[in-house]
Each structure stands twice: as structure tokens, then as C-alpha cells.
Amino acid sequence: MISLAAKTASIKEPKRSSALVRQETIASYLFLLPSLIFFLGFVIYPMILCVVTSFFDSTMNRADIFVGFANYAELFADPIFIGALRNTFIIVVVSVPVTCAFSLWVSSAIVDLPEWTTSLFRCVFYLPVVTGSVAVTVVWKWMYNNYYGIFNYLGKAVGLIDKNINWLGDEKYALGCIILILLTTSVGQPIVLYVSALGNVDQSIVEAAEVDGATDFQCFWRIKWPAIMPTTLYILVITTINSFQCFALIQLLTSGGPNHSTDTIMYYIYYTAFKLYRYCLLYTSPSPRDRQKSRMPSSA
């Protein structure tokens, strides 16, 4: 007697015709076509154009001149570019781990609070994200002011400093001030994501581990941390991208000064392209001499 499982296994799905498969494939590509056109026109083509332009001396006042790899040699010989590269690396290395660690700590502390309290904390930390960068910059510029800023006032009040410090006009402090602002505007989204991820962890597993004698750290490290790893990876990616793209704070606060101490790759590209009009900006730069003549060091 043939079993029911054998009968079921012997039944094969009807094979679809090649015409139907071809029709579905064409329909799929037609749905994909608008996005593909946008991707080719606004991503792939500009990338190819940038690579081609990097082999020319391209300015607005004359025709492009083919120079081969001279632009690359000039770029890496420019100490201002090397400084911008170093500053960008410092911003990424400092801001990414600090943002992720602080966001995870805050989220772990507020996730078990009453719902209205958790929502309040999320709103407070997310407020700088939805606030315009210009408004945020104006507030921080007032706080950093070397005459009446709140940092100088509090520093002298508690005895940390003896005299006012020009926070944005001193090479020793300017980049650190930029990183501090970037941190306050970057933790909002990770906190919201971490609170959501921690709230989705199966509490029955956590309770079972606690009954077996697991400590809070062991519950976090063995149960919660693996569960929120996908969220952590996403946060690391977006935080790294945001750190590399730090531009508005630099432009509005220091313009790369003082003495190029807050230059980043994004601001360097902007200044080279839209101030000096050298459109091989993504891979080339003006000479250090030309750049120094055309730009005075900025200070707060």
C-alpha cells in the first residue's frame, strides 16, 4: 500500500511555459527600469566622469588639459589634503565607537523604564537630529563663544580654567569641539534603534537565564547582544557614513580654520571645486601655494 507521503512526493508541480517565464522576467525588468536609469544617471555616470576628469587640469577659464597622473601626485604632495585626511580619520575613529557605545548604554538604561519615560528620553535625544543644522550650529557657537560662552563661564566657575578660551579659534581645541557637536547630533537615531531592538528581545529567555543564576552582564552579553547585532551593524554603517560626510558644521563654524586644523575631506572638496573652480576636485587639488594665497586661516 502506497503511503500518503509517497503519493504526495510523486505529484510534481506543473511546469510553467517558457513564454510565461519570459513575460514575468520582462515585467520584472520594466519595474526595475526607472530605478536602474536613476542609478546609472546619478551614480555610475558621475563616478566615471570623476575618474576621467581626474586625468585633466579642469578649470572654468580655459579648456581642459590632459595631465595624466600629475593631479594624483599633486594631491598627495599637498600638506593641506594630508591634514584634511588625518582630521577626517580622527573624526571617524573617535565619533563612531563613542556614538555606538553611548547609544547602547543609554538605550539599556531607559528601555525598562515606564513607557512615557522612555518616550521622553527618546524625544530629548532625537531632537537635535530633526532640528536644522544651522539652528544647532548657532546654539553651539554661542556656547563656545570666547567672551560670553557658557563653557568659559562654567569652566571658570568650577575652577577648571583661569581665563577665557577661544574654543573655535585655537588649533588645540577646534577639532575636539567639532567632534563634540557631531556626537550630540548623531546619538539620536542609534538610541531609537537600540531601544526598539532591545524591546524585541525575547524576555522569556532572559527570565530563564536569571532563574538559572545569570548576572545582568551575562544576560546582556549572551542573550541581548547577539540579538541586536544586526541593528549594531546598521548603526556602525550609518554612523561611519555620517562621520565621513561631516561638512555643515565645518562650513558654518570654522570654515576649516584655524590654520586648516578642522579641514575634512568633504570641506576640502567643496573649497577646491566651488571656491577655486578646479573641477577635478574628487581626486585632485590646487597646489599648496595657490590654496594658501586664496584662503586665509579662519578663526572664531
Where are the language model's segments positioned?
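Short, Lys/Arg-rich, polar N-terminal cytosolic tail immediately upstream
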Residues: M1-V21
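A structural signal for multi-pass alpha-helical bundles of membrane permease subunits
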Residues: Q23-S285, R289-R291, R295, A300
